[in-house]
């Protein structure tokens, strides 16, 4: 997890999975695709604005973003990706695609919630941590449980290749296909 520790209302993996499945279905319908490989950047740029007229997507320079790879401002309904992350995500780099999906997770899960800053990570249970929730959402939308029948029996490397994610993400997410 990265970013600040922000305490949000608790969410289970099951509820995050449902939110990711609903979001993916809505985005696929608008973008007219249902492939296992989700074109996440195109979803953020072209499909999501059709579902939410107040939403905006921006790409900022490395100089402006600094160490932040992505930012989501729920009150302004904006997702921002750092330029190099955006470009690599378009090229299919798994880590950068996950960053884009992670930011979508913040947008979907945290737009209408009260947040508070934790004094330390020790004060947070993972299911109350906005970063864990967004990471979970990213894994669930890019490697969906709803398409687990296409993924069960595959090696983590095969899942990474099919879904366009890193080997680390595929290894972790594959534990939840059982």
How would you describe each model-predicted region?
Residues 1-178:
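Active-site hotspot residues in diverse enzymes, especially metal/ion-binding acidic/histidine motifs
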């Amino acid at each position: 997890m990265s970013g600040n520790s922000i305490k949000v209302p608790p969410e289970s993996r099951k509820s995050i999975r449902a939110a990711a499945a609903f979001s993916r279905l809505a985005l696929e319908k608008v973008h007219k695709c249902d492939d296992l490989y989700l074109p996440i950047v195109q979803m953020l740029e072209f499909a999501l604005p059709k579902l939410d007229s107040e939403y905006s997507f921006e790409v900022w320079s490395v100089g402006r973003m600094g160490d932040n790879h992505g930012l989501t401002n729920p009150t302004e309904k904006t997702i921002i990706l750092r330029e190099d992350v955006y470009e690599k995500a378009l090229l299919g780099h798994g880590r950068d695609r996950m960053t884009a999906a992670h930011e979508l997770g913040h947008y979907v899960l945290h737009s209408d919630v009260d947040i508070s800053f934790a004094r330390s990570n020790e004060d947070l249970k993972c299911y109350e941590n906005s970063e864990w929730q967004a990471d979970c959402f990213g894994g669930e939308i890019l490697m969906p449980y709803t398409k687990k029948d296409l993924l069960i029996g595959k090696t983590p490397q095969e899942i990474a290749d099919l879904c366009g994610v890193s080997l680390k993400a595929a290894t972790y997410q594959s534990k939840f296909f059982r």
